[in-house]
Amino acid sequence: MRHYEIVILVHPDQSSQVPAMVERYQSMIKEKGGKVHRLEDWGRRQLAYSIDKVHKAHYLLMNIESDQGVISELENAFRYNDAVIRSLILKRDHAITQSSLIMQGAEKGKSSRKEKVDAEAEASEEA
């Protein structure tokens, strides 16, 4: 089996359907004997350029291990799903399981904001 990295851009109006879509795609992969090594939901982000007059999209990243048949099924599912405005499937040499740079940056941002709030609360208690 080969390793793949998949990025999916979902129409922002369909963000509520993302968990169901992810579940459907994961079940497609697992039914055929594949594995999902990493799944990240990057949320709604600004696009670099508009796609079909849409300026934002809901981003998903998946790293999977499967055979070519599953990839063909996923490509067809992406193509015929109106909520998916773009998809990219890349072949990788090995499985990638660590967090992406985008998720690491988001985690650092959350921790630094929490530290800032704690520091402000401590300062207000002293005053």
From Swiss-Prot:
Example GO BP: translation
Disulfide bonds: none
Keyword Ribonucleoprotein found: yes
UniProt keyword list: Ribonucleoprotein, Ribosomal protein, RNA-binding, rRNA-binding
One MF annotation (Gene Ontology) recorded for this entry: small ribosomal subunit rRNA binding
Tagged with keyword RNA-binding: yes
Gene3D superfamilies with a match to the protein in the record: 3.30.70.60
Family: Belongs to the bacterial ribosomal protein bS6 family.
Function: Binds together with bS18 to 16S ribosomal RNA.
Record protein name field: Small ribosomal subunit protein bS6
Gene: rpsF
